[in-house]
Amino acid sequence: MPEDLGYEKLLEQDGFFAHLLGRSPTGAERDLTYGPDLPVVLLTGGPGMHKGRLLREVRDGFAAKVPVIHLDCASPVFEVRAAAEPGARSAATEALAEVARRLSSWQGTGGSFAFPRLFAGLAVIASGVADGTSAAVAAEVERYGELPQRQRLRGLAAGDFWTGVLHGTVRNLLTALVADGLGQYPAAASTALLDALFDRLAPRGKVELQRIYGAYPGAAGQPRHGLSNLADDFQAGDEAREVAEGFLFRALREDLEAAYASASGWLRRVGRPGLLLDHAESPLGEGLLRAVLTDRRGGQRDRVVIVGTARRPDG
């Protein structure tokens, strides 16, 4: 990017991104720009403006110091993965799961992240698998098995969210689904999944799911209803599916917020986490941006830095 566009200044030790993320490329603390009313940054322009290069430079320069994930929203990989089970996956859910997987193995300051809130939502939409049996649902849920637990200190991982050791919780959840032997009845498999999920929640987990999924449209404060409605909306497709996908994105950001806001997170984590959405003009990117903008306009606050790029053919 030409120097007169400020490319280098944006990335320097005391530049825009250092203050947005709260850390310099060398790891020094920086005062945060903006408060809890965090904006979404969108870089627009025509070809040759090096917007994608800028996002890659942000990733390469900062990702070792703060958890920054780069996502190419125009990549066909998410659509390809979703096509294998279109009733239980979409490009958006595959992208969110990819972000969570990368952060669940992040090895920087504060360690990896757990995503029990996102996991709960992804698990319930797994009931839409084509086969429809409890065994097929369990196999789909197993794809997300690493998300609700941290990769370090497994015995302590999010133990206040689930009862017992979380790794065993996920395994027991799958065992319970298969043992039910419900045949090809997606509704019954979904009910069994919700039963198994809520049976394994610790008190804090119940409070958190009530707070998050109890706020889902039509849930009236009941997390089971919220999760069930989310699964139904996902199955309905079109605008209803977009609502479900947007809520799953909120759940992912809630997991990140919880990791920072907890007592241990306050002591150990630094800066702000970042999500870099290249080619945000694509359907996947537009959906993610619309979801976070809608949430923030409605008063939902989180500390996740969202930076996107959008190509304009007219320059």
Name what the model sees in each region.
Residues 7-32, 38, 243-313:
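Conserved Walker B catalytic segment
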Residues 51, 312-315:
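Elongated scaffolding segments in large macromolecular assemblies
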Residues 44-48, 85-89, 93, 234-246, ...:
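Short, charged/polar micro-motifs that form catalytic or ligand-binding hotspots
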Residues 60-89, 108-121, 208, 229-230, ...:
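Conserved catalytic segments around the Walker B and adjacent sensor/switch elements
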Residues 79-112, 222-225, 229, 249-260:
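Conserved NTP-binding/hydrolysis module of P-loop NTPases
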Residues 46-79, 179-180, 184, 188-203, ...:
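P-loop NTPase Walker A phosphate-binding motif
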Residues 101-247:
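Coupling/switch/interface segments within P-loop NTPase motor domains and analogous charged loops
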Residues 1-62, 71-72, 81-85, 89:
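Walker A/P-loop-proximal flanking segment of P-loop NTPase domains
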